[in-house]
Each structure stands twice: as C-alpha cells, then as structure tokens.
Amino acid sequence: MLSVTAKKRILADIKNVSNDDIKKQGIFYSMNEADMTKGTALIIGPADTPYEGGFYFFGVQFPPDYPFAPPAMTSLTQDGITRFNPNMYREGKVCLSLLNTWHVGERWSGCQTLSSILLSILTSVLVNKPIQNEPGFETRTESEQSHVYARMVLHANLQTAALKMIQSPPEYAADFYDTMADAFNKNKKKLVDLAVGLQEYDNKTETMDFFRMTITYKFSTVADKIRDCVPRNPFPTEIE
C-alpha cells in the first residue's frame, strides 16, 4: 500500500515530467489510470545519434516506498535480435546507476526524480557512439567494432524503433501516437537520408560477437518504406 508521501511524490514527478520543457526534449509520459504506480515513458531518439527519430518506450513501476527507492524501468522497444544499447538488454533490463542497477556513477537518492532518470537516458545512454557505454570500450569509440555496432543500431532504429513502431504500434503507444506521427513526419526526410547514405552496405552481413548480434543490411528497402509511410492512428478515439 502506498503511503501519503509516496502518492504525493509520484504525482509531483508525473506533473514535472509532463511539462513543456521536458516534452521539447522528446520525453513524454503516460500514467496508468488504474494504477498511478505504473506508467509508460517515451523518449524520441536524439539527432546525430544512431537513435535519431526512433521511439524508445520504457515501462515504469514506482515502488511502495518511493522516493526512498528508485522506480523499476523496463526497455520495451525491442526486436528480439538487437541489443540497442549496452545499458538496455534484450529482455528489457535497463542498467543505470540512478536505478541502482549499475554500480558506477551517481546512485539513486530521494532528490532524484522520474525526469532526472529519463533525461539521463536521453543524454547518457542514447548517444552517438553507444559502445562507449560498455565497460572496457570507453576509449575505443573509433574502433571498427564501434562503427559496426553503431551501424547495426542505426539499421534497427530505422527499421524497428521508427518504422515498425509507427506502422504497427503496440497498445502501450496509444496515448503517444499523435505525438509519434508528428515526429515521424517531421523527421521523415532525415531518416530516409540516413538510410540512403548507407545503402552501400545493402546485403552485407555484419556480426558483433560481443553482443551476439548478426545482421544483413537492407538500408534501401528501409528507406523506401519510410518514404512511403503515412502514419494513421489505429487506436479508437472517443467521440464527444
């Protein structure tokens, strides 16, 4: 059972994460109307990273003793193949010091908020050279492995996090779909350009043994599908 302190703090965090300044950075949140301790967060991948224009969803679960313990977070944007980031596991685990799921870096304290967690993911996880987040690879950002991994993530970002999410959105995306459609239309040309710029890799297979990933690129096909995609909200809307 939630304490009065936990209820007040959760509501305050939700209000804070829903303000315009946070939304301008591509961060959005929807509370579960049946259970305020549960919710879904959306981070739109930042420009100039392999995550650009992708829709990255996270399940949020506040604990009964919030804010004395951090919320639990689950990475929902998955394709079953790609390790989208060293901090985001295929099974959904989010490895972050603020969540007390990683031992290096700033730990959770009661002064932290849901906003600070999501901003940390935006700025420290969804980065230009994601391999730098893997222990032992911090100084190997210009290595061949770094470039291969970033390319694999970008392909999955375009194919799954951007295109599939807008064409076949899961139920948890319902509250965000109009925002997603606006972002997709705004970013469409850039997403197509990113795919076209790497079409020389079409039909080439690359492997990242460290993350157990193998991918055969289809950048031209992805570019065509993004170019032709017209977002249509599949979720029923209430008629007043």
Model-based region annotation:
Residues 1-54, 61, 65-240:
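UBC/E2-like fold recognition across ubiquitin and ubiquitin-like conjugation systems
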